[in-house]
Amino acid sequence: DEVLDINYEHLFCTKQLRKSSVLEFISSTDYKNISILSASRELSTLVYTIYDRSKEAGGTNIELYLRHNLSLIKDDFDYIIIDNSPFKSYLTTCAICASDKIVTPICVDNFSYDGLMSLFDTIEDLNSKYSLAIEFAGIFMTRVAGRTTLYKQMFESYENMFGEKFLPVSIRNCIAVSESNTTFEPLLTYDKRCTAAQDYIEL
Protein backbone atom coordinates (compact mmCIF):
# COMPACT_ATOMS: atom_id res chain seq x y z
CA ASP A 1 0.00 0.00 0.00
CA GLU A 2 1.10 3.57 -0.62
CA VAL A 3 2.33 5.35 2.50
CA LEU A 4 -0.06 8.14 3.37
CA ASP A 5 1.11 11.72 3.73
CA ILE A 6 -0.16 12.19 7.27
CA ASN A 7 -0.80 15.59 8.81
CA TYR A 8 -0.20 14.69 12.44
CA GLU A 9 -1.20 18.17 13.55
CA HIS A 10 -4.79 17.39 12.56
CA LEU A 11 -4.74 14.23 14.65
CA PHE A 12 -3.19 15.71 17.79
CA CYS A 13 -4.24 19.36 17.68
CA THR A 14 -7.71 19.35 16.11
CA LYS A 15 -10.92 17.75 17.31
CA GLN A 16 -12.23 15.76 14.37
CA LEU A 17 -16.01 15.63 13.98
CA ARG A 18 -16.36 12.57 11.73
CA LYS A 19 -15.11 9.01 12.00
CA SER A 20 -14.11 9.09 8.34
CA SER A 21 -11.71 11.97 9.04
CA VAL A 22 -9.81 9.81 11.54
CA LEU A 23 -9.92 6.64 9.45
CA GLU A 24 -8.04 8.50 6.73
CA PHE A 25 -4.96 8.30 8.97
CA ILE A 26 -5.13 4.48 9.09
CA SER A 27 -3.37 2.22 6.57
CA SER A 28 -3.94 -1.47 5.94
CA THR A 29 -1.02 -3.90 6.17
CA ASP A 30 -0.03 -7.22 4.62
CA TYR A 31 -1.01 -8.94 7.87
CA LYS A 32 -4.52 -10.16 8.60
CA ASN A 33 -6.61 -8.02 10.95
CA ILE A 34 -3.80 -5.51 11.54
CA SER A 35 -4.00 -1.88 10.49
CA ILE A 36 -1.48 0.81 11.35
CA LEU A 37 -1.11 4.51 11.88
CA SER A 38 2.56 4.89 11.09
CA ALA A 39 4.98 7.17 12.91
CA SER A 40 7.25 9.74 11.33
CA ARG A 41 10.18 11.99 12.15
CA GLU A 42 7.67 14.83 11.95
CA LEU A 43 6.41 13.77 15.37
CA SER A 44 9.64 15.02 16.96
CA THR A 45 8.71 18.61 16.07
CA LEU A 46 5.01 18.20 16.80
CA VAL A 47 5.65 18.52 20.55
CA TYR A 48 6.39 22.21 20.00
CA THR A 49 3.21 22.65 17.98
CA ILE A 50 1.14 21.03 20.71
CA TYR A 51 2.75 23.30 23.28
CA ASP A 52 2.11 26.42 21.19
CA ARG A 53 -1.47 25.38 20.44
CA SER A 54 -2.16 24.73 24.12
CA LYS A 55 -1.03 28.27 24.92
CA GLU A 56 -3.05 29.76 22.06
CA ALA A 57 -6.14 27.81 23.13
CA GLY A 58 -6.12 29.51 26.51
CA GLY A 59 -6.35 26.39 28.62
CA THR A 60 -8.32 24.21 26.22
CA ASN A 61 -7.60 20.54 26.97
CA ILE A 62 -5.58 19.90 23.81
CA GLU A 63 -3.95 16.89 25.50
CA LEU A 64 -7.33 15.14 25.18
CA TYR A 65 -7.75 15.68 21.43
CA LEU A 66 -6.04 12.42 20.47
CA ARG A 67 -8.29 10.58 22.93
CA HIS A 68 -11.36 12.18 21.38
CA ASN A 69 -10.25 11.40 17.83
CA LEU A 70 -9.47 7.76 18.60
CA SER A 71 -12.81 7.38 20.38
CA LEU A 72 -14.52 8.00 17.03
CA ILE A 73 -13.01 4.82 15.57
CA LYS A 74 -12.73 2.55 18.62
CA ASP A 75 -15.76 0.46 17.63
CA ASP A 76 -14.05 -0.41 14.33
CA PHE A 77 -11.21 -2.26 16.09
CA ASP A 78 -10.89 -4.91 18.79
CA TYR A 79 -7.82 -3.17 20.21
CA ILE A 80 -5.99 0.08 19.60
CA ILE A 81 -2.38 -0.24 20.75
CA ILE A 82 -0.14 2.81 21.07
CA ASP A 83 3.56 1.95 20.98
CA ASN A 84 5.07 4.97 22.60
CA SER A 85 8.51 6.25 23.50
CA PRO A 86 9.15 6.37 27.27
CA PHE A 87 10.59 9.88 26.86
CA LYS A 88 8.37 12.33 28.74
CA SER A 89 6.92 14.89 26.33
CA TYR A 90 3.62 16.34 25.17
CA LEU A 91 3.29 13.41 22.76
CA THR A 92 3.67 10.95 25.63
CA THR A 93 1.09 12.86 27.64
CA CYS A 94 -1.37 12.78 24.72
CA ALA A 95 -0.80 9.03 24.31
CA ILE A 96 -1.38 8.37 28.01
CA CYS A 97 -4.55 10.48 27.97
CA ALA A 98 -5.77 8.47 24.97
CA SER A 99 -5.26 5.15 26.76
CA ASP A 100 -7.58 3.09 28.94
CA LYS A 101 -4.76 0.85 30.18
CA ILE A 102 -0.98 1.19 30.33
CA VAL A 103 1.45 -1.74 30.07
CA THR A 104 5.13 -0.87 30.17
CA PRO A 105 8.34 -2.83 29.57
CA ILE A 106 11.29 -2.23 31.88
CA CYS A 107 14.98 -2.97 31.51
CA VAL A 108 17.31 -4.33 34.16
CA ASP A 109 18.54 -0.96 35.40
CA ASN A 110 17.68 1.81 37.84
CA PHE A 111 16.78 4.23 35.05
CA SER A 112 13.74 2.10 34.20
CA TYR A 113 12.64 2.18 37.83
CA ASP A 114 12.92 5.97 37.97
CA GLY A 115 10.94 6.26 34.74
CA LEU A 116 8.29 3.93 36.12
CA MET A 117 7.81 6.10 39.21
CA SER A 118 7.48 9.15 36.96
CA LEU A 119 4.86 7.31 34.87
CA PHE A 120 2.79 6.58 37.98
CA ASP A 121 2.86 10.26 38.91
CA THR A 122 1.82 11.26 35.39
CA ILE A 123 -1.11 8.81 35.33
CA GLU A 124 -2.29 10.02 38.73
CA ASP A 125 -2.01 13.67 37.70
CA LEU A 126 -3.88 13.17 34.41
CA ASN A 127 -6.64 11.12 36.04
CA SER A 128 -7.13 13.89 38.57
CA LYS A 129 -6.84 16.79 36.11
CA TYR A 130 -9.21 15.40 33.47
CA SER A 131 -11.39 13.02 35.53
CA LEU A 132 -10.06 10.03 33.60
CA ALA A 133 -9.78 6.40 34.71
CA ILE A 134 -6.47 5.40 33.12
CA GLU A 135 -5.38 2.08 34.64
CA PHE A 136 -1.82 0.92 35.10
CA ALA A 137 -2.28 -2.67 33.93
CA GLY A 138 1.19 -4.14 34.34
CA ILE A 139 4.93 -4.24 33.69
CA PHE A 140 7.26 -6.84 32.24
CA MET A 141 11.03 -7.10 31.91
CA THR A 142 12.64 -6.84 28.49
CA ARG A 143 16.09 -6.97 26.85
CA VAL A 144 17.11 -9.61 29.37
CA ALA A 145 20.64 -10.78 28.55
CA GLY A 146 20.60 -13.70 30.95
CA ARG A 147 19.50 -14.73 34.40
CA THR A 148 22.19 -12.75 36.17
CA THR A 149 22.25 -11.94 39.86
CA LEU A 150 21.06 -8.40 39.11
CA TYR A 151 18.20 -9.71 36.97
CA LYS A 152 17.08 -12.10 39.71
CA GLN A 153 17.25 -9.37 42.34
CA MET A 154 15.22 -6.93 40.25
CA PHE A 155 12.72 -9.61 39.22
CA GLU A 156 12.08 -10.45 42.88
CA SER A 157 11.93 -6.77 43.83
CA TYR A 158 9.35 -5.91 41.14
CA GLU A 159 7.35 -9.04 41.93
CA ASN A 160 7.13 -8.06 45.60
CA MET A 161 6.37 -4.44 44.75
CA PHE A 162 3.66 -4.92 42.11
CA GLY A 163 2.20 -8.36 42.79
CA GLU A 164 -0.24 -9.40 40.04
CA LYS A 165 0.63 -6.35 37.96
CA PHE A 166 4.15 -7.70 37.48
CA LEU A 167 3.88 -10.03 34.50
CA PRO A 168 6.20 -12.99 35.16
CA VAL A 169 7.39 -13.38 31.56
CA SER A 170 10.68 -11.71 30.60
CA ILE A 171 11.62 -10.93 26.99
CA ARG A 172 15.10 -12.24 26.28
CA ASN A 173 17.68 -10.49 24.13
CA CYS A 174 17.65 -11.90 20.61
CA ILE A 175 19.40 -10.83 17.40
CA ALA A 176 16.22 -11.60 15.45
CA VAL A 177 14.54 -8.57 17.06
CA SER A 178 17.08 -6.18 15.53
CA GLU A 179 17.01 -8.05 12.23
CA SER A 180 13.22 -7.90 11.97
CA ASN A 181 13.27 -4.16 12.72
CA THR A 182 15.78 -3.69 9.90
CA THR A 183 13.53 -5.53 7.43
CA PHE A 184 10.34 -3.85 8.76
CA GLU A 185 8.80 -7.25 9.42
CA PRO A 186 6.93 -8.45 12.52
CA LEU A 187 9.05 -10.69 14.71
CA LEU A 188 6.46 -13.47 14.62
CA THR A 189 6.71 -13.75 10.85
CA TYR A 190 10.45 -13.09 10.67
CA ASP A 191 11.42 -15.83 13.12
CA LYS A 192 8.57 -17.24 15.18
CA ARG A 193 10.86 -19.79 16.84
CA CYS A 194 13.40 -17.30 18.23
CA THR A 195 13.51 -16.86 21.99
CA ALA A 196 12.06 -13.34 22.01
CA ALA A 197 9.11 -14.36 19.82
CA GLN A 198 8.35 -17.30 22.10
CA ASP A 199 8.53 -14.98 25.11
CA TYR A 200 6.09 -12.53 23.52
CA ILE A 201 3.70 -15.37 22.69
CA GLU A 202 3.82 -16.53 26.31
CA LEU A 203 3.30 -12.96 27.51
Please state what every model-predicted region is.
Residues 1-203:
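P-loop NTP-binding core
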